[in-house]
Design a protein with these regions (language model features):
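Conserved C-terminal guanine-recognition region of P-loop GTPase G domains, centered on the G4
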Residues: 55-123
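Conserved beta-strand scaffold positions in the cores of enzyme catalytic domains, especially
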Residues: 39, 47, 123-126, 201
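Basic/polar, acidic-poor N-terminal "presequence/leader" segments
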Residues: 170-197
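Membrane-inserting effector segments that mediate pore formation, membrane fusion
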Residues: 189-274
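Canonical P-loop GTPase G-domain recognition
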Residues: 101-157
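Conserved G1/Walker A P-loop phosphate-binding module
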Residues: 1-50, 221, 227-230, 273-275, ...
């Protein structure tokens, strides 16, 4: 049995563009009699796009094995109708925030404050069709949801065969997207470390700590966006806490700029590398591993010219 993906949301949320980017195909023919639904066929999964503009009247078919409920990251806020629809979603659903490249740090905070009150963090994915960010996360989480649905519906389901066919279809795409994501993530880390070095030039004791911490937080938000992760303050605090990346403690004994600059840059670089690895893993790395990655990257960065 070939699984079915149901993709819904308002017209402006780039549903069609997202599907085409993920599977590189065009709609073949209407699947249902309901107006506007179109079928995108692949060897491993069929995508059904609902083109209804009214989110309250989108009939999610019972046979759908997974659901993408798309909302527009480029909008200032989603509607009450969308909020009501999100509240009613079950475990088959992912809330897909499109146009994530247009979101700034404050907008991400506001959005996550609302969405995390409706669904779990694992059910939220931020994606950008233009930058290809978040696509590996979206595909991998969709695979897991479909696998669980098939297992629950059929005793004859063979996970190994499904995994093999899915991986064969998506492997090249995942490789290209992941490479692009890694390049973008590394550029954010290098930029943030260089910015930390510039901030640390301030000669006053601890006057630079607040902007340095803000720089770290901004970097982590950007990295989370690259990998499609629903980020908030609790996740940031966990990452910084696990890496032992307290800039206050590390800079407290170094008031001279020529001493602070390499410390600030190296700590920021280390936190960035640890956060990147954490998001790449799908948030599965433990604290000890994060600390190990942080220390190794910090030591490497200490030898660089900032």
């Amino acid at each position: 049995m070939k699984p079915t993906m149901f993709v819904c949301g308002k017209q402006s949320v780039e549903k069609t563009e997202l599907i085409r980017t993920v599977i590189h195909t065009f709609p073949s023919s209407p699947l249902y009699n309901t107006s506007g639904n179109e079928l995108f066929e692949t060897p491993v999964v069929d995508f059904v796009e609902a083109n209804s503009s009214d989110t309250n009247k989108i009939p999610v078919p019972d046979e759908a094995h997974a659901i993408w409920f798309c909302i527009d990251g480029g909008a200032s806020m989603f509607s009450q109708e969308e909020a009501d629809s999100i509240k009613s979603l079950d475990e088959r659903a992912l809330v897909v925030v499109t146009k994530s490249e247009s979101l700034n740090e404050d907008q991400i905070k506001s959005l996550m404050d609302i969405l995390l009150g409706f669904v779990s963090r694992d059910q939220i994915v931020l994606v950008s069709v233009d930058k290809k960010s978040g696509l590996p996360c979206l595909v991998n989480r969709t695979k897991k949801i479909i696998g669980n649905s098939l297992k629950n519906l059929s005793s004859s389901f063979f996970p190994s065969r499904f995994d093999r066919e899915w991986d064969r279809f998506f492997s090249r795409r995942l490789q290209l997207w992941s490479q692009k994501n890694e390049e973008e993530a590394n550029s954010y880390i290098t930029w943030a470390a260089g910015r930390a070095a510039a901030i640390a030039i301030v000669p006053l004791p601890l006057a630079d700590v607040t902007p340095l911490v803000a720089n770290e937080i901004y970097m982590i938000y950007r990295l989370a966006g690259v990998y499609g992760i629903a980020n908030d303050q609790s996740l940031i605090s966990m990452i910084i806490g696990c890496t032992g990346g307290s800039l206050v403690g590390k800079l407290g004994s170094s008031f001279l700029p020529f001493l602070k600059i390499p410390i600030a840059a190296a700590v920021t670089y280390g936190v960035g590398k640890a956060a990147k690895a954490f998001f790449e893993s799908g948030m599965e790395l433990n604290g000890d591993t994060l600390l190990e990655i942080f220390e190794k990257a910090k030591d490497e960065a200490s030898g660089l010219f900032w």
